[in-house]
């Protein structure tokens, strides 16, 4: 479909499953596997911030196809590799009222025990908040559920 996949490379004759290898390697060394997924932007489909750019039928069709593609991709990640420790959506996952795919029900159905990060409905942990990969010490990134960092809490005392 596009040159951004492993079908175009010589590694394992284009039939390798890099996610399978990653998960198997994690388990081999006693590491709980987590998956990092980016669905907020898609250059091939002209998606920016969960929304197809442009107007008219073509944009609406791309929007619908993008949503279905993302939901199926997340379903595949959640069903092919056994139990996952976490699924991290870079830039978040859209809420059901938004334009983007609704992936939370997929993760909840197929990976009920995995940590989910994040949309306005659910965020099981906090991001440290640094694109440099550094955070202040100590860094406590937990908070009670249900709570989303997009919503205001009832009181500051409820949160670490």
Language-model regions, residue ranges each:
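Mature catalytic domains of secreted/periplasmic carbohydrate-active enzymes
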Residues: 1-160
């Amino acid at each position: 479909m596009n040159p951004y996949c492993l079908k175009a490379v010589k590694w394992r004759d284009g039939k390798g499953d890099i996610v399978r290898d990653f998960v198997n390697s994690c388990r081999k060394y006693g590491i709980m596997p987590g998956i990092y997924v980016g669905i907020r932007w898609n250059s091939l489909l002209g998606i920016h911030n969960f929304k197809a750019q442009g107007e008219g039928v073509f944009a609406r069709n791309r929007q619908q196809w993008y949503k279905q593609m993302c939901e199926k991709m997340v379903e595949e990640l959640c069903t092919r590799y056994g139990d996952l420790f976490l699924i991290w959506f870079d830039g978040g996952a859209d809420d059901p009222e938004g334009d983007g795919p609704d992936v939370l029900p997929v993760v909840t159905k197929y990976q009920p025990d995995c940590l989910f990060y994040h949309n306005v409905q659910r965020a099981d942990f906090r991001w440290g908040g640094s694109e440099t990969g550094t955070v202040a010490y100590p860094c406590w990134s937990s908070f009670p559920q249900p709570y989303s960092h997009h919503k205001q809490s009832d009181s500051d005392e409820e949160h670490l």
